[in-house]
C-alpha cells in the first residue's frame, strides 16, 4: 500500500520541487 502511495506521490512532489526551483 505505502509503496503504491509513494510511487503515486513521488512524481507530483518532483514536479512541485522543479516548479519551485524555476521560480527561484
Swiss-Prot record:
Record family assignment: Belongs to the ponericin-Q family.
Keyword Secreted annotated: yes
Alphabetized UniProt keyword annotations: Antibiotic, Antimicrobial, Secreted
Subcellular localization, as worded in the UniProt entry: Secreted
Disulphide bonds in the chain: none
GO cellular component term, pick one: extracellular region
Function per UniProt: Antimicrobial peptide active against Gram-negative bacterium E.coli MH1 (MIC=2.5 uM) and P.aeruginosa PAO1 (MIC=10 uM) and against Gram-positive bacterium A.globiformis VKM Ac-1112 (MIC=0.6 uM).
Main location: secreted
Domain of life where this protein originates: Eukaryota
Protein name, entry field: M-ectatotoxin-Eb2b
Transmembrane parts of this sequence: none
Tissue: Expressed by the venom gland.
Any one of the GO BP annotations: defense response to bacterium
Amino acid at each position: 500500500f505505502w509503496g503504491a502511495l509513494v510511487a503515486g506521490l513521488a512524481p507530483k512532489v518532483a514536479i512541485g520541487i522543479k516548479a519551485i526551483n524555476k521560480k527561484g
